[in-house]
Amino acid sequence: PNHSSNLHEWFKEALASEKGSAARNRYIFRDGKGANGELPPSDWVSHFAPSSWTHESTFGGKNNQWFLHWFAPEQPDFNWENPEVHEDFLKTLKFWSDRGVDGFRIDVAHGLAKDLSEPFRSMPVHEGLEQRGNKGKGIWGDRNEVFAIYKEWRKLFNQYDPPRVAVAEAFVHPERLPLYASTKTLGQCFDFRFIETPFEAHAYKVATKEAIELAQKNKSSCTWTLSNHDQIRHATKMGLNPAVNRRAWMLSDGTSHPLDKESGTANALA
């Protein structure tokens, strides 16, 4: 819900529309800096590009504006300050819920709300994990305003029997996880501690204990996550290299094969 494709009909309509139009207001377009608007509106950087802003002429736009994307230029961000965006997502969620889906995985759940007040705050280094300490007041990640969106969704989900499930993908400070896993918002949130925790028994024990205590304190839940499509799969990290003769490996004490000095030698993503 943070962004669409640049090939989405909405974005193509936005590029073909005039400045200030309703079609462009579904996304985040701004005039550039410089004498002729040739510079990005701010110094914000993205996950996948040097700048979070791309000039619309890249995709055929003719209004000399820039659009915001926290990820790739081909993934323009929606403007969640626009009620039409809210309404369209509720329509989409209802469409699939009416057809019997059990639930939804919410990608980049922490990223929808943004501080678009001008002049823009400076962010020459991607906020990324640094937003974990912003207590809901960063530029992009984990802003408090995002929970109003999910409360809208929860009201819709609870109209069904059983209620529709939702799980957030949100890289946030552990103390903020219950806000996404609350029964008033999405209900579940992936806990990425096991991805970030060293593969060591005591570290896993501490991470597990902290997560359970936090969930109990806030009457939320734990949704353990060992890997996902953005990370090395745990089958790769922990599994035996396919080239290894398993019987010989076991008889040699399980450590001596040169191709298996450590687990995860394939180092494969999804």
Tell me what each language-model feature is.
Residues 109-120, 232-242:
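Short, solvent-exposed beta-strand-terminating loops
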Residues 1-94, 98, 111-174:
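Acidic/aromatic-lined carbohydrate-recognition and catalytic surfaces
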Residues 3-43, 150, 154-270:
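Conserved alpha/beta catalytic core and glycan-binding cleft of carbohydrate-active enzymes
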